[in-house]
Swiss-Prot record:
It is an enzyme of class 5 (isomerase). One of its GO terms (biological process) is protoporphyrinogen IX biosynthetic process. HAMAP family: HemL_aminotrans_3. Its main location: cytoplasm. It is found in: Cytoplasm. Pfam families: Aminotran_3. The modification N6-(pyridoxal phosphate)lysine is found at K265. Belongs to the class-III pyridoxal-phosphate-dependent aminotransferase family. HemL subfamily. Its EC number is 5.4.3.8. This is Glutamate-1-semialdehyde 2,1-aminomutase. Keywords: Cytoplasm, Isomerase, Porphyrin biosynthesis, Pyridoxal phosphate. One of its GO terms (cellular component) is cytoplasm. It comes from Escherichia coli (strain SMS-3-5 / SECEC). Homodimer.
Amino acid sequence: MSKSENLYSAARELIPGGVNSPVRAFTGVGGTPLFIEKADGAYLYDVDGKAYIDYVGSWGPMVLGHNHPAIRNAVIEAAERGLSFGAPTEMEVKMAQLVTELVPTMDMVRMVNSGTEATMSAIRLARGFTGRDKIIKFEGCYHGHADCLLVKAGSGALTLGQPNSPGVPADFAKHTLTCTYNDLASVRAAFEQYPQEIACIIVEPVAGNMNCVPPLPEFLPGLRALCDEFGALLIIDEVMTGFRVALAGAQDYYGVVPDLTCLGKIIGGGMPVGAFGGRRDVMDALAPTGPVYQAGTLSGNPIAMAAGFACLNEVAQPGVHETLDELTTRLAEGLLEAAEEAGIPLVVNHVGGMFGIFFTDAESVTCYQDVMACDVERFKRFFHMMLDEGVYLAPSAFEAGFMSVAHSMEDINNTIDAARRVFAKL
């Protein structure tokens, strides 16, 4: 047995499923998950000594690559002053100044410890601010594991939501309406059925949890218009897309102004950080200035703030997003060329430093139904054959891939060459 296999066997006796987040268990592709020893730049190194070109990037945060010296040094310097104080620090102020400068729609920002905390808190704030209970989310989008968000669509287009996890009471789910991503008609229908009851829409501007599905041109502006028409707030969940699709996020890339924005992943530079913010009048409703309660023992943790501040300063440098786009475009085009040579039907979506690989005969993938029609079994084989080639992709057909500026064009070309060999055998 390999060292990863031995560790996984031991982990399953001590940790549910052997992992601390389900997708890491390789249940979407089968086999034994890799146990990682270290990472540097664009590469992961497992406990058995094998190196991999990494397109998971810790599920998004590693936009600069692993073990970036500016972030590492900031963490070391901050740790020497203490790990946590439970009191305000100067770095929290500097971090808030930087975030609100980089994302102009955020007049104010509150730091939390995860993307789930950010979305959960933003929804509570939207409900408190509007005095309404219902929310709209989209089929195939993921916003963390808060009870109100672990909800699937009912059997009819306008039925109330149903829990998609045991432990979520139906009374919670009934306030969540699930619409179809990239389908404005379904959203209007929900508003028309509940015109005075919907507090907010929450949406991934690029859906990154049904692989990578960008919005159609009219979708995000249409959501903004519907929120304005019916008096609801628009929450854009930029946990994945923030500082990655563009410096000011997908909202800037697509030209839409939200009322609230949720951030995570890159904002922490690899440390556990989330944030939410937006319009001043809405944010003023948060405790201690307003009645909507939100708190956290480790929110604004000095080590995490130092890591995030260093990361965002690097991400804001000229050329970063142009490099991400160039590398991702080259990878997408190369994979499509290699697949066509082998007669493999393939769609590759990409925006900025995000991409998604779909084995499908369809010309495009624009919604949850399109994603579910793809060949998952072929993806599983592709994943393991690429892993054997030293390329680490997301171990699920329903998760996006992530590029970093640490990837070289040689890494990209080597990945395309590996895919060409795999496609020939697939």
